[in-house]
Structure formats: structure tokens, C-alpha cells
A protein has these predicted regions:
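N-terminal beta1-alpha1-beta2 submodule of the flavodoxin-like/Rossmannoid cofactor-binding fold
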Residues: 1-104
Length: 106
């Protein structure tokens, strides 16, 4: 099984990252990849809908790390999102990434 762990914390070595690392250990024997959104260059969604023009693959006019990350999401059998709670909600980093998921919805 191919499992993608996405760490939505702005702190690369914070509690969320530690929890996801423990999960990775518990999933020994599976193919596990962990991605820290804090280490990626991701811009906010422009709402231009260009990503909806190609039905075969996700695309975006922005030149950032989203294309590679969305490819990992599509190839994964399971995706686990980890985030700290700030202001009774998930982190801004995870919100930004979730907004960019629109490229997957055709």
C-alpha cells in the first residue's frame, strides 16, 4: 500500500511532524512518504479555473510545488493529513493546500 502523510504544520519539527513520524513507524512494511508543507513553495489559489481545462491531469498556471504534490496524492492509496489546530481550525498551510485541491475535481 502506498501511503502519503502530509504534515500541515508550519513547524518542521513540531508535534504534528512527530506524530506523523510515529505513524510512519507503525506502518512498517508499507510504502510511506511524508511531505511537510512548510518545506514546499505553494501559492494561494487564483480562482482562475485553468486547472479545470485539462480533464486528464491536474494543472495550474502557477509555477510552484503543487503539481508534484498533487501527483503524489493521485498515486497514493491513502492520504493522511496532520495539522495543529490554530484558532479552532487547521493550519493556514493546510488550508492553502486544500484550496489547491480544486485541480483534482473535474
Amino acid at each position: 500500500m502506498n501511503i502519503l502523510l502530509i504534515c500541515g504544520s508550519p513547524r518542521k519539527q513540531g508535534n504534528t511532524a512527530q506524530i506523523l513520524r510515529q505513524l510512519s513507524i507503525a506502518l512498517e512494511g508499507e510504502t510511506v512518504t511524508m511531505v511537510s508543507l512548510a518545506e514546499l513553495h505553494l501559492n494561494g489559489c487564483l480562482g482562475c479555473s485553468v486547472c479545470q481545462s485539462d480533464l486528464e491531469k491536474p494543472g495550474c498556471v502557477q509555477q510552484d510545488d503543487i503539481t508534484a504534490l498533487l501527483q503524489q496524492v493521485m498515486e497514493a492509496d491513502a492520504v493522511v493529513y496532520g495539522t495543529p489546530l490554530y484558532g479552532h481550525s487547521y493550519s493556514g498551510q493546510l488550508k492553502l493546500f486544500m484550496d489547491r485541491h480544486v485541480a483534482l475535481f473535474k
